[in-house]
């Protein structure tokens, strides 16, 4: 199997390298850049067909409809406005009847998390004052 695959590779390489037996340069040079068409002579000016501009597509740009004449006014159907979607705007729920009032469970508010909001430390009593270390202010940075 290895020999068969190797033979295929060798044949492919030989065909790729030695397959082009025509070593002569091409007779017609390849045009790399497109050259301009030669200018038409002034005496050879014949009329050129220029088509009319196409009208705009009716769905892309519509002109305003012409005003109706006063005597030709007929009623136009105007649909009712749609109600708002129930999930977008809810009206207040109707009040319950007094005889049907039953207690509703309202949970107590949760205390704030201790790391999020701490109350101030309680003031020390005047008789229990001990000295507190207050560091010296740092000198300004030399580059500032």
From Swiss-Prot:
Spans annotated as Disordered: 20-144
Compositionally biased spans, kind Pro residues: 134-144
Gene Ontology annotations of biological process type: defense response to bacterium; innate immune response
Keyword Signal applies: yes
Pfam families, A to Z: Apidaecin
Signal sequence region: 1-19
Propeptide stretch(es), residue numbers: 20-42, 63-70, 91-98, 119-126
GO cellular component: extracellular region
Subcellular location: Secreted
Domain of life, source organism: Eukaryota
InterPro entries the record matches: Apidaecin (IPR004828)
Keyword vocabulary terms for this entry: Antibiotic, Antimicrobial, Cleavage on pair of basic residues, Immunity, Innate immunity, Repeat, Secreted, Signal
Main location: secreted
Protein family (similarity comment): Belongs to the apidaecin family.
Function: Apidaecins have bactericidal activity; predominantly against Gram-negative bacteria. They seem to interfere with cell propagation.
Designated name of the protein: Apidaecins type 22
């Amino acid at each position: 199997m290895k020999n068969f695959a190797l033979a295929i590779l060798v044949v492919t390489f030989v065909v790729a390298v030695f397959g082009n037996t025509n070593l002569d340069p091409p007779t017609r040079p390849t045009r790399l850049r497109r050259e301009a068409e030669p200018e038409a002579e002034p005496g050879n000016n014949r009329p050129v067909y220029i088509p009319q501009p196409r009208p705009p597509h009716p769905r892309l740009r519509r002109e305003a409809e012409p005003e109706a004449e006063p005597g030709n006014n007929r009623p136009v159907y105007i649909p009712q406005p749609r109600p708002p979607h129930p999930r977008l705007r809810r009206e207040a729920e109707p009040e319950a009847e007094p005889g049907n009032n039953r207690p509703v469970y309202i949970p107590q508010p949760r205390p704030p998390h201790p790391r999020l909001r701490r109350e101030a430390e309680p003031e020390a009593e005047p008789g229990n004052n001990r000295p507190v270390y207050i560091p010296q202010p740092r000198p300004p940075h030399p580059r500032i």
